[in-house]
Amino acid sequence: CVLVELVQAETGITPANKDWVIALKEKCESLCVVLIVDEIQSGFGRTGTLFAFEQYGITPDILLLGKALGGGLPLGAFVANTKMMGALTHSPVLGHITTFGGNPVCCAAGNAALQVLQQSNWIHEIAVKEQFLLEQLVHPSILNRSHKGLWMSLQFSSSVLAKKVAACCVANGIITDWFLFAEDKIRIAPPLSITMEELSEAVNKIKVSIEEAVASN
């Protein structure tokens, strides 16, 4: 099998090349290799569509979901077609792998969250909000920005400066942190429900935080 994130999260929001993804899918099909797509962080509208794979013109054999799936409660999912799931019912039966699987309260929360997402215009508004961030979230100390939908990383000259910026952001009311494999970048991932007014206020606070961090560096 091949396991991929179409948008690598912890490297600092790194989207895969569409042609490469299509070629990967074709190669997997030609070799009868299962393609597993991890959308635990990118799923449920974060990238501008319900799932990121929709923007790449492919359908994975297996889809991994979590985080936003539960609407605030712990919930994960392994999604595949009937044939694929049927292969997991014997030799051996995989029903023993979870104690709390299918928790009814978490599943109800996930279902309710999905209904709210589908009934709102949040996903349709992401392109406008993404463009606003690209136009307004600019500062000389930001060396690079990588983004996909309402999801962005800001790169600074060092991990020390990035962590100072993150700390100043938190002090100014903006929750952020750095990335597991990119400590010189900070994460911009506001809730999909954020209004343009709130987004504008957040951008201003981030700029102020950068100024404060640079001054103390």
What function would you assign to each model-found segment?
Residues 1-217:
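Conserved N-terminal phosphate-binding loop of PLP-dependent enzymes in the Aspartate aminotransferase
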